[in-house]
């Protein structure tokens, strides 16, 4: 869905711009609502249909272009697509002391997000406990993401649907 390398990326973007300027039937799928999407709704041209709800309910056969505002990966099949990825995900990370290999753990975290259809670009911040501040995995994640640190007291106040017995032991 996104090529991040030079000529191919610009060729894809030029194709998307060309399709939009030609006013081909376009689906605008909004999975996040904010000031930016409100503006898109207010200024939507006639060749664009706005969709909400479940992406699987959008009949892609009606469109030659899809624009998505979403933190999720969606398969647009052969329909050209432009993804706007808002930073809306808050990811909590806990790990063993000096966990490694660092690269493998970071790849596992990102892979788990992708396998759950979340785009890593949608991460607003990663949260962890203060004691993990100097862990190599956290330092590596800090290169790409904002990290928020919390005290054990602060974390006790947060309701978690599936609490970890290991984490609760340290709280």
Q: Predicted regions span which residues?
A:
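Long, charge-dense
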Residues: 1-2, 137-171
């Amino acid at each position: 869905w996104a090529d991040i390398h030079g000529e191919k990326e610009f060729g894809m973007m030029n194709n998307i711009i060309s399709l939009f300027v030609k006013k081909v039937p376009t689906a605008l799928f909004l999975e996040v609502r904010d000031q930016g999407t409100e503006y898109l709704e207010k200024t939507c041209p006639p060749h664009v249909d706005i969709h909400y709800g479940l992406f699987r309910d959008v009949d892609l056969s009606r469109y030659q272009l899809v624009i998505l505002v979403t933190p999720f990966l969606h398969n647009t099949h052969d329909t050209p697509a432009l993804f706007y990825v808002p930073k809306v995900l808050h990811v909590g990370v806990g790990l063993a002391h000096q966990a490694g290999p660092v690269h493998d753990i970071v790849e596992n975290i990102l892979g788990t997000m992708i396998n759950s259809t979340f785009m890593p670009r949608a991460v607003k911040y990663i949260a962890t406990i203060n004691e993990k501040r100097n862990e190599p995995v956290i330092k590596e994640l800090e290169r790409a993401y904002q990290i928020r640190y919390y005290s054990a007291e602060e974390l006790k106040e947060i309701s978690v649907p599936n609490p970890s017995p290991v984490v609760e032991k340290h709280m």
